[in-house]
């Protein structure tokens, strides 16, 4: 496990691959980044660096319930900061279900940092 502080919250993350454009993969629901590891390994083998992380309130990352915005908006801004800290911008950002919704918000909130979106199983949510 590797941790960093992102906007006052300890975030667990992993980088897969050592060269190429950056990609962030985000599982759905409240699943840990481990769910996306097989896909990350495949993408990295094709010449990309992949950022995986446990979003706040998920997996090994800290719990923080004080946000005044939707959780997916908070996650999008956390991801922006995490990618910034690792000189990983601009990036392709993608995910499934809640990870897809968070990715779309990332693109809307940080268009200059978004190379493209990879959206899988785009579903509803509260």
Question: What function would you assign to each model-found segment?
Answer:
Residues 39-43, 67-70, 111:
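Glycine-rich, phosphate-binding/catalytic loops in enzymes
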Residues 52-94:
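Active-site loop/oxyanion-hole signature of alpha/beta-hydrolase fold enzymes
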Residues 37, 80, 104:
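Active-site phosphate/pyrophosphate- and oxyanion-stabilizing loops and adjacent acidic/basic residues
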Residues 89-125:
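Conserved hydrolase catalytic core segment
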Residues 9-62:
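Conserved HGGG/HGGXW glycine-rich cap/lid loop of the alpha/beta-hydrolase fold
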């Amino acid at each position: 496990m590797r941790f960093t502080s992102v906007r006052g919250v300890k975030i667990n993350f992993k980088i897969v691959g050592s060269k190429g454009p950056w990609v962030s993969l985000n599982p759905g629901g409240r699943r840990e980044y481990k769910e996306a590891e097989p896909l990350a390994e495949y993408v990295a083998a094709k010449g990309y660096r992949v950022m995986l992380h446990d979003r706040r309130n998920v997996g090994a990352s800290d719990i923080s319930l004080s946000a005044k915005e939707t959780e997916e908006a908070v996650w999008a801004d956390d991801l922006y900061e995490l990618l910034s800290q690792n000189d990983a911008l601009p990036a392709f950002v993608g995910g499934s279900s809640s990870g897809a919704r968070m990715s779309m918000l990332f693109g809307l909130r940080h268009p200059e940092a978004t190379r493209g979106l990879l959206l899988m199983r785009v579903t509803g949510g509260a």
